[in-house]
Amino acid sequence: MLTPMVAGGVVFPGLFLLSKNTLQRLPQLRWEEADAVIVSARLVSSVQAIMASTAGYIVSTSCKHIIDDQHWLSSAYTQFAVPYFIYDIYAMFLCHWHKHQVKGHGGEDGTPRALGSTWAVVRGYLHKEFLMVLHHAAMVLVCFPLSVVWRQGKGDFFLGCMLMAEVSTPFVCLGKILIQYKQQHTLLHKVNGALMLLSFLCCRVLLFPYLYWAYGRHAGLPLLSVPMAIPAHVNLGAALLLAPQLYWFFLICRGACRLFRPRGSPPPSPCQTQD
């Protein structure tokens, strides 16, 4: 178990540092630290999402029996991804920190003027990103132990499908980068927003009805009978996982309405609702 976790603990922070240093030091680029940090964090999130989605696709398509079939990649990638969620909490804080400095709240050397200011940044970060931080903490403290211990090797198909929920993440990250560089008016931003909306709907919202339908087909039950046929704690867990997805999807839809509504000036992006 430790080998994949150690690998994840090296890969994700290492990729972040490599990207940040490259963007800052290449003579052709010479980016400011704030820009390099924010873009590097988005890059690492996109890479993790692609890896998770690929692993999920391999696992879910390899498991013909949705309960008993196993695939080594399901447990290996779950362990590998745990350090990512810990790293990403810190990476999101760094992004928030640098945005705070850009707004003029830092000292001349780019650091907060006082300890009180530092705590103000921390409080602002936790207030703005509370749901995401809670989500990441739950992944590490709840979902990981459950997937390793409670499942007892069963249900790899469902875990693979859950990993494929990350399909929408690269579109979210690209949208935030485009916003960072004031490209909300471009065709790329609109196409990316539409793809983000579609991928989020299919891979994060409709994922849960699909999993219920898949179990119902396996057990010979109609879809509406599945919730009554499975343990209550499974329904509770699914509801807790679905709730933030519905909230984020609502924000994306609200932003998409503003994006595609004709206006005199460039409108906000659907990604801006999650930034």
Swiss-Prot record:
Coiled coil: none
Alphabetized GO MF terms: sphingosine N-acyltransferase activity
GO terms of biological process kind: ceramide biosynthetic process; negative regulation of fat cell differentiation
Record keywords, A-Z: Endoplasmic reticulum, Golgi apparatus, Lipid biosynthesis, Lipid metabolism, Membrane, Transferase, Transmembrane, Transmembrane helix
Reactions mediated catalytically: sphing-4-enine + octadecanoyl-CoA = N-octadecanoylsphing-4-enine + CoA + H(+); eicosanoyl-CoA + sphing-4-enine = N-eicosanoyl-sphing-4-enine + CoA + H(+); sphing-4-enine + hexadecanoyl-CoA = N-hexadecanoylsphing-4-enine + CoA + H(+)
Keyword hit for Secreted: no
Listed InterPro entries: TLC-dom, TLCD
Domain of life of the native organism: Eukaryota
GO cellular component, one term: endoplasmic reticulum
Annotated EC: 2.3.1.-
Ranges annotated as spanning the membrane: 130-150, 159-179, 194-214, 232-252
Disruption phenotype: Knockout mice exhibit a significant reduction of the cone photoreceptor light responses, thinning of the outer nuclear layer, and loss of cone photoreceptors across the retina compared with wild-type animals. Knockout male mice are fertile.
Tissue: Each isoform has a distinct expression pattern. Isoform 1 is highly expressed in brain. Isoform 2 is expressed at low levels, if any, in all analyzed tissues, with slightly higher levels in testis. Isoform 3 is expressed at very high levels in testis and, at lower levels, in white adipose tissue. In epididymal fat, isoform 3 is expressed at higher levels in obese mice compared with lean mice. By contrast, isoform 1 and 2 levels are significantly lower in obese mice compared with lean mice.
Keyword Metal-binding in annotation: no
Any Pfam family hit: TRAM_LAG1_CLN8
Domain called TLC: residue spans: 34-261
Protein task: Involved in ceramide synthesis. In vitro, isoform 3 stimulates the production of C16-, C18- and C20-ceramides, isoform 1 slightly increases the levels of C18- and C20-ceramides, while isoform 2 exhibits only minimal activity. May interfere with adipogenesis by stimulating ceramide synthesis.
Listed name of the protein: Ceramide synthase
Native source organism of the sequence: Mus musculus
Organism classification: Eukaryota, Metazoa, Chordata, Craniata, Vertebrata
Gene name as annotated: Tlcd3b
